[in-house]
From Swiss-Prot:
This is Putative fucosyltransferase R654. Its EC number is 2.4.1.-. Belongs to the glycosyltransferase 10 family. SUPFAM superfamilies: UDP-Glycosyltransferase/glycogen phosphorylase. GO terms for molecular function: alpha-(1->3)-fucosyltransferase activity. InterPro entries: Glyco_tran_10_C, Glyco_trans_10, GT10-like_C_sf. GO terms for biological process: fucosylation; protein glycosylation. Keywords: Glycosyltransferase, Transferase.
Amino acid sequence: MESCKIICISQTGYDKDISSIKENFAGCDFIKSIDMDQVTSNNILRFFKHYDNDIFTLNTVKTIMNHYNAWEKIANSNDNIDIYFIIDEAVTTPKTISLTRQLLLKKTNDQQIIFVGGNSDLQCQDLNIRPFDHKNSNFLSAYLITKLAVKILLEYIYYNGIKTTINKIINDCFGNCFESIPYLFMVNSQNEKNVFDNKRITFPMIDNNFEFNDYIFYPNLDSAGNDICEVYADIPTLREIANKDDNCIGFNTYGWIKFFVTKEERFTMLKNKYYRCDGLYVKKRHDQLIKKRNTIMTQDKIKIVREKLSNSFVKIFVNNDAKKYSWHLVEAVLKIFPNYKLVGPTDNYDISINHLVEQFIFRPDSFNILITGEPTMNITYFDMCIDTKYTSQSSITVYYPFIFSSMREHRKSLNHTDYIKPKTKFCAYMYNMRYPHRIWYFNLVSKYRQVDALGKCCNNVDIKDSRSHFTEESTYNDIAIELYSEYKFVLALENIFWPGYSTEKLINPMIANSIPIYWGDSTIFKHINKKRTIYIPDFPNETDLLEHIKNIDTNDELYKSIINEPIYINPDFSLDKLEENLSINIGKVFSDQEIQTLYI
């Protein structure tokens, strides 16, 4: 990259520092801040839909939409420039900006976005580029962006809303994002004399005047609990998305795409939130099917499968994510049938097995099985749910703790003796999601000694995010065990306290020869040795808990006695045996017994 064009957004409406900018840059375009009085309800709805009222200040809305206008200007330009430097008026431009610009362009290579801003300490000779750090809160102050990245962003915004796009940039490095270190600019907008009006924005409801020949509209009604995909878009865009997928039944005006809709008598009320008349759009060609939905009961489907077993083979469809993440559970189902054939999603089949990650396929005349990973699913129309908690909304619940499924995600050893090493650190805490109880316990234990926060939540250690790592060689679980193996303790906190719900949060520290300080349901202690843990609910108050942790930390013999406890209650514990029992239990469903709940 040899050159770039500069775009300056004049936030406050007056030309602060423009003279110094012009001294350093040629061909700089200036865009004045938008007038919020000229912004239509449609624009605000399209950009900021799916966030609660009053969530954004006027300042935030203006800033984001100003940058959106700059992106549109770039996308629509006919110049031959591929790189653009967008700067906010509310930044200090150092005298050395010309030099830093040249250094930055030389180091940019083929990165799509480079953020700058946040630090006034500038050492040009030490300038370098690194992957974007989401903790940099001033990323909209100034950045280089390619025309290609701009077009990708605009397309993403069209379907997902602008605020979601910004979050995507921050958290997922959308479009190969990098940043310059040291930063080029220091944000000083707090010192401006002209302060934005920081009043809250309330989203105005707009008219719903859309009538489509190929859809039936149900005003203020919805098929609740049966959603698979949410899109932050207006009604015409939602229809466009729904029409691209033949398996899609319809959508509601809140933005939920439907791959299944209940019978009309089971519809629920939908309040007007975005439009003066929110509701449900259903494709006309599916409407008659909806009215006949669920006329075949689960027990009738079981009888049909049973007859197939005695006369021929059973056709089974398995979706891709069930194959990728839960093949051990799929196999537990397949073992039941001596004669079966795996078929594709467009074929006729007797049984479907879906994992709730991708879009699942549901047919009312087949026996539909759902495999879940999270504890809060509220899906009512599957015949069977292999669930991580004791109860589900399906006709039949088969309980299988996620902690054991997570052990199948490992690519490396599950034997704790393979991870014996000196404990050089105190306590680890590795989470992405910021739940209040997690932060509370992190702060509590940190009162005693520093707890290393290895994830995005409360992060205080420079470490690469591995939460999405999932390859043939290793997964995030393997990485967690390697990290934990250096620590005496691990704060092992589930995201929710739900009967039967336990995950890798408990088992990974134990495999790593650390002591988990565990918060979660106690049902799992049927299989896992509670003496090998510090179980938070056993302590009446935080003082007793913290004293217990201190006592173990300072008493080597006590620490060793806990570490030397067996991990499993059953000395012959085996995942293979658990899955064999699971298969036997699922097989009972297709016997003459009427069963609603099965446990391992």
